Amino acid sequence: FHRQPLLRELKEMNSILEMLEHTEVVMIAGNHDYIKKNSYYRTFSWASHVHMICSQEIDCVELDRIQTAVYGCSYHSREIHDPVYDHAVPEGRQKYEILLAHGGDEKHIPIKSNQIMTLGYDYVAFGHIHKPQLLVENRMAYAGSLEPTDTGDIGRHGYIEGRITGKGCQIRFVPHALREYRNCEVKVDKSVTGHVLRQKITDMIAEQGMQHMYKITLTGYRDPDIWYELDHMDSY
């Protein structure tokens, strides 16, 4: 959640996750939905296959059916300045071991990718940054948010699909969000009238997709006698 969740929202989320029949779900709270004193996370009862790591210290969920241990911790405050993950060594509880982490900047658990890679996890799943980002090939990545949360979240959004076998870990980014925020540039010159500009924008959107949300920047120099009525440029 990008804020403190309401009880009804946890119930809705749990109801959706209950529909998963062959999946184990492991979650932690981040800096926006951190576990404060009266957080509903503290008392909520999740479905049997949904596991919430509420501890502010590194803890572990063991998933015997899939021979996997997931390590992580939840935020109990908006900021954590200590590099908590630097010494979060896996304990060898299961065949496969994953670190579920949140942060990456100086105010939210600073990280050093090289240091974390020396710990020995099969995979490190990071959250906090909204844009998908590969840190170490097939070993460490930010999945990003499933959907863009504000106009700054440009580009594709989706999830990371991974497979861990005896041969190692393989991951791939799967685009999933139907809509994107896109920043586009339209060049103008003295020959471009308001009508021509509107058609340029219309053609560009038709080519890239009407479902997306656009921020359009005009570059160049217009005829001083021409005035672009920007409120009338939306042709859809």
Regions found by a protein language model. Name each.
Residues 1-5, 188-191:
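Short, glycine-rich nucleotide/cofactor-binding loops
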Residues 3-163:
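His/Asp/Glu-rich metal-coordinating catalytic cores
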Residues 165-167:
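Short loop segments at secondary-structure junctions
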Residues 169-236:
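Accessory, non-catalytic peripheral segments of nucleic-acid enzymes
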